[in-house]
Each structure stands twice: as structure tokens, then as C-alpha cells.
Amino acid sequence: MTDTLSDYVDCTPLLDDREALDRFYDEHGYVYLRGALDRELVRTAAEQMLEGLIALGHADPATTLDTLTIDSFEAVDEVAMHDYVKYDDLWNHPSTLKVWEKVLGEPVFVFKSTTIRYYPSAAGSAEPSFLTPLHQDGFYIGPNKDFRTAWIPLLPTSHGIGGVAVADGSHKKGPREHVVTEQFRRFGHAVRGIPAEEFGTDEQLLFSPMEPGDVLIFHAFMCHKSIPNVSANPAGMRMSMDTRIQPASSHRGFNALTPWPESAKDASKGILSKITGTPTTAE
């Protein structure tokens, strides 16, 4: 693996070809769709996120989505922010469910746990506080591993604004060891990740700029990490949401049935519940 980023492959043309779509997913571990979601629904979620940041005192009342900036992601009361963003209206809208069902090829259940992100630019910082290491969502979420993560931007992203990089085909090796790495800290705590030296040269990192309405869907064992927001001239906000989808017939675990705030506000469940919504002793 190198730090050189290649583009995602746009899988939108495969949506009506079941065999080709499944073949691509099985080989690469992700599906990237351009403009598949209703842009008005995505815009509404972005405006709700802006409303929350203003109401909680982190943005000026006159701020718009085009001019928004905040001082710190971690300074915002994330549990309170969830009261403003009605993400389930987007995830479970009939037009969105149609996309999920086309991707999975069967009826789906959308997790009740959603992660929301609003990262300001950290231009000039070598190690922004909100970096995440290479990791697998399946390390934290279960017990079944047939879920897929769905990640969407609420505002346009770029190489400067960042987003999610996936390691092409890395899901095929199954679960990997996650080790505590002091370099990566969230809310003052070191978090676990997969050492870069564990990856082969064939597991190329992929990242593409995305627009509202685009969606990236990937395997529970897809290795992925954040690309930091280091945008400058102009600096921009990175606003995103992610959830998980799974076959409706599959077992529904803690993360599938528990809204993120209910887990995150329970300090006894540990720092990973604050980050992922999943209680775990692996910290």
C-alpha cells in the first residue's frame, strides 16, 4: 500500500445489472454511486446540521452552508446535535430504500445508529484531532457481518476537504487485528487501527471527490480511513453522515437497534461508544 490515491470506480451504470454489480462488489468490496440519492433530501439534512450548529452556539446565526465554519468538531455537543438532524427521514425515504434494495438485491433494514460529522479545516496541522486510522467497521459492529456501511457527503468534498479512503479489495482477507496507536486519538483517547505495513501492494487506497447525492457503500471488513480536511483558500467544512444497511432477514444486533445518542451518552460503555455507537471493551 502507498499513500497515492486512485479514484473510486463509478458503479452507477451497474445498478440494473445484478450479476455485474455483485461481481464488482465481491471483488472490490465497495459500490460507489453518483447522484443516486435525492439531492433535496440530502440538502435538507445539511440545513438541519447547520441549524443545530447555530442553535448550540458554534456558528453565527447569519451563517449559510456556503460560509459555515466552526472552531472545533470535538467542542460540539454531539448528542444534542442528533436532535436536529432527521437522518432517518433520508435513510428510510422510499427513494433511498429503492437504492439500498438495488445494491443488496433484497429487502433491507437500516440501522437505527447514525454517525454525523462536521469537520472544519485543519490546514497547517500535521495530525488533525479527528483523523481515523485504517480500520474495519466489522471489528466494532456485530454479531453478524453481512451489513454494509453507507457514507454520504452533505456538502461537496474535494482532495482538500477529504472524506473516506478505502483499500481496494481489502475485505477479502476477513477480520484483521486492530492495535492501539497513540498517533490517532479521539476525545483524548488513543484508538485502534490496522498498521499500514499489514497491507499488500495490491490493496490500493481509493478516494474521489463526491457531491451531495453520491453514496459510498462498503463491506463490513473493508479497510478504510479518513482523509483529513486540510482545505485552504478557501477553507471548507466537511459535513457527512453514515449508517449501516443489512438484509432485512438478518439478525439485528446492538448497533442496528440502538440510536447512537442512547449509547454515546452512557459513559460506562467507553470511548468507542462515543465514536461508533457500539459498546466495547476493545479500547
UniProtKB/Swiss-Prot annotation:
Pathway(s) the chain acts in: Antibiotic biosynthesis; pentalenolactone biosynthesis
Keyword Lipid biosynthesis annotated: no
Gene3D superfamilies reported for this sequence: q2cbj1_9rhob like domain (2.60.120.620)
Coiled-coil ranges (or none): none
GO annotation terms (biological process): antibiotic biosynthetic process
Pfam families: PhyH (PF05721)
Chain sites annotated for binding substrate: R117, R186
Keyword Oxidoreductase belongs to the record: yes
Recorded superkingdom: Bacteria
Needed cofactors: Fe cation; L-ascorbate
GO molecular function: 2-oxoglutarate-dependent dioxygenase activity; iron ion binding; L-ascorbic acid binding
Binding site for Fe cation: H135, D137, H224
Binding sites annotated in the UniProt record for 2-oxoglutarate: H135, Q136, D137, W151, S226, R238
Keywords: Antibiotic biosynthesis, Dioxygenase, Iron, Metal-binding, Oxidoreductase, Vitamin C
Protein EC: 1.14.11.35
Reactions this protein catalyses: 1-deoxypentalenate + 2-oxoglutarate + O2 = 1-deoxy-11beta-hydroxypentalenate + succinate + CO2
Region (Disordered), start-end ranges: 260-283
Family membership: Belongs to the PhyH family.
Function summary: Catalyzes the conversion of 1-deoxypentalenic acid to 11-beta-hydroxy-1-deoxypentalenic acid in the biosynthesis of pentalenolactone antibiotic.
This protein's name: 1-deoxypentalenic acid 11-beta-hydroxylase
Organism of derivation: Streptomyces exfoliatus (Streptomyces hydrogenans)
Lineage: Bacteria, Bacillati, Actinomycetota, Actinomycetes, Kitasatosporales
